[in-house]
């Protein structure tokens, strides 16, 4: 399951239907981190650490982790999915026991947010956040 969730970010799987496949990794991670906090299960922790590494390996040179291509980004459910990627990473960061992995997460989150901030806003060549989706009236 975790491998499949992370694999969604290796190609623009949501381009064709502007779907929301990208939200599941973060939702699963959030719940799994809460479960780990309760159980402290070593096998679960290792599984989570491994899938975090797999997801981080999907980050492109621009800083994006998305199931949308750059040509299709910031429409449909893209920003919603990116939010869940960030939330999932942050939840794991809170339980992460490896300093290097924590640093890698921090760097990734900063790069992702820098990219979003550069493209979403009221500035020139930026897309207004209310125009990033037609769902829920933008």
Where are these regions (language model features)?
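Glycan-recognition and catalytic cores of secretory/periplasmic carbohydrate-active enzymes
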Residues: 1-138
């Amino acid at each position: 399951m975790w491998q499949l969730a992370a694999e969604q970010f290796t190609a623009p799987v949501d381009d064709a239907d502007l779907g929301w496949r990208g939200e599941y990794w973060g939702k699963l991670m959030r719940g799994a981190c809460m479960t780990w906090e309760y159980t402290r299960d070593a096998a679960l922790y290792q599984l989570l650490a491994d899938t975090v590494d797999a997801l981080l390996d999907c980050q492109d040179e621009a800083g994006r982790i998305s199931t949308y291509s750059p040509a299709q980004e910031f429409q449909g459910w893209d920003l919603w999915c990116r939010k869940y990627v960030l939330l999932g990473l942050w939840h794991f960061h809170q339980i992460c026991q490896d300093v290097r992995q924590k640093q890698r997460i921090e760097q990734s989150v900063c790069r992702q947010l820098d990219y979003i901030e550069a493209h979403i806003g009221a500035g020139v060549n930026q897309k207004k956040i209310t125009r990033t989706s037609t769902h829920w009236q933008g």
